[in-house]
Amino acid sequence: MVGWLFLGLLLGLFFGILTYRIVTGRRRPDRLTLAEYWVYVEEPRVPKIEAVMTRMVSENPHTKPGSPCISNREGMLFTDLRLHYAAVLKSKNPHAFRPDLFSVSTEPTAEVLERLADCPGFLKCRYQCETLLKDQRHLTFLPHMADAFSDLAKGHVVYDPISEEIMTREEFKERISSAKNLESPLFHLRIVWERAEEGWRAVTKGLMKVGRSEWASSFQEQDQEVLVAGLFT
C-alpha cells in the first residue's frame, strides 16, 4: 500500500513538473530577450492605455493604406504580462539624464543634450522574456509604443539602452517611417568599433532584443575597422 502511495506521489510530481514546463516554457538564462526604450518627455506621466492603443492602431501616422503598422498579431502584446511601462522622474534618477555616464558607444549630439535639459522625466517601455519566443512581434510593437508615448507626452529624445543609441524625437520618428520592416536587424542592430586594453574589436549592440548574446570579433589594429566591421554585415 505504501509502495503504491509513493508511486502515486512520484507520478503526481512528474506530471506537475511537466505541466509547469508546458505552461511557462523552457527557461534559458542565456536566452534572455530584452527590448527597451526611454522617451524623454515634458509630461512624465504614463498616458491612459486607451489613448496609447488608439494612437498606435487606428491613428498611427506611419500606417499605409491596406497595411496597418499594428495588426491583431502585434496588438495582443497590449495584454502581455511581459510588457512593462512606467514613468521615471529626473528628480529621483538624475543619472539617467547623463548620457556621458552611459556606454562609450552612446554618442549624444549637442541638440540631444540641450533637449534633455528641458525634460523633467522619461517614459520607459520594456519587453522582457526568459523563455524562447515563437516570433519577434515585439520588435515592431515596442518602437511604435515609444513613438506613441512621444506624441502623447510631448517627447524630445528617445534612447535605446539595448542598441545603446540616443536620438531626437524627429530622428526616431523618421527611422520608423522609412523602415520597411521593423523586425529587420537593420532597425535594431548596430556594429560598434570598441577599444579595450587588448586592442580594437567590432561588437554588436542589439542582439539581446532577440534573445542572443552580443557578438564580438577578435582584437585587431585600429585601422582594421572597415574590414572587420564589414564581416558582421
List the model feature ranges, each with a label.
Residues 10-14:
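Core hydrophobic alpha-helical membrane-spanning segments
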Residues 164-233:
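Aromatic/basic-lined ligand-recognition segments
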Residues 45-114:
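N-terminal low-complexity, intrinsically disordered segments
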Residues 37-41, 130-138, 219-224:
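Conserved aromatic-histidine-acidic binding/catalytic patches
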Residues 86, 90-192:
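Internal, hydrophobic cores of structured domains that mediate oligomerization or house catalytic pockets
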Residues 1-8:
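Feature marks short, highly hydrophobic, charge-poor N-terminal signal-anchor/signal peptide-like helices
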Residues 31-47:
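N-terminal mature-domain "stem" immediately C-terminal to a signal peptide or N-terminal signal-anchor/transmembrane
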Residues 16-34:
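Transmembrane-cytosolic junction motif
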